[in-house]
Design a protein with these regions (language model features):
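Acidic, glycine-enriched catalytic cores built around paired aspartates
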Residues: 1-177
């Protein structure tokens, strides 16, 4: 970071590196992956396990551990629950709750690690595929090894109400958190 420190007037004037007190406003970002899958999974669990009581917690865990092998009926039930990206208030609210929880937690860590701000970046790149390959099955119906949703987009194939519904879902989370 010495080279980067040379690019900041504060560091140059104080003769200190960025992380040695040279910069006036030090901030950071944290890239997150799987937010949509997490929200869709929590929506499915809430609906099927707790509200409708169609699947027990033990049945769900068994199906997830088996990567849905021998549990296709459960997988299809999970897939059919409301998903983010369709302008569905319950699914979109779950994503908002996940997003706010992650953002608030990360923001609260700023002081602990000596930053003036610490923000979440919901990233869009090919890492969703890599992360999916390294992640076991999820309660949204995604099998182990399948790609996760890319950034703040719906999971592949789950946005079935068209582009306007997707855009309506996309703008619901606050960009100011």
């Amino acid at each position: 970071y010495l080279y980067m420190s040379l690019l900041y007037d504060d560091c140059f004037e104080k003769g200190k590196g960025m992380f040695a007190g040279g910069i006036r406003y030090l901030s950071g970002t944290l890239e997150t992956y799987g937010n949509t899958n997490t929200a869709d999974s929590l929506t499915a669990i809430k609906e099927l396990v707790y509200e409708k009581k169609i699947i027990s917690k033990d049945e769900l865990l068994k199906a997830l551990d088996a990567n849905f092998i021998g549990n296709e009926k459960i997988r299809q039930q999970l897939i059919k629950t409301p998903k983010y990206g369709n302008d569905n208030d319950s699914a979109d609210k779950m994503l908002i709750d996940v997003h706010e929880h992650v953002c608030n937690y990360v923001r609260d860590q700023a002081e602990r690690v000596g930053l003036q701000s610490f923000l979440v970046v919901v990233i869009n790149n090919s890492a969703n595929t890599l992360m999916g390959h390294q992640t076991s099955a999820s309660a949204d119906g995604r099998k182990s090894g399948e790609p996760m949703a890319n950034g703040n987009n719906p999971s592949g194939g789950s946005d079935v109400n068209g582009p306007t519904a997707f855009l309506n879902s996309l703008v619901k989370p606050s960009p100011y958190i």
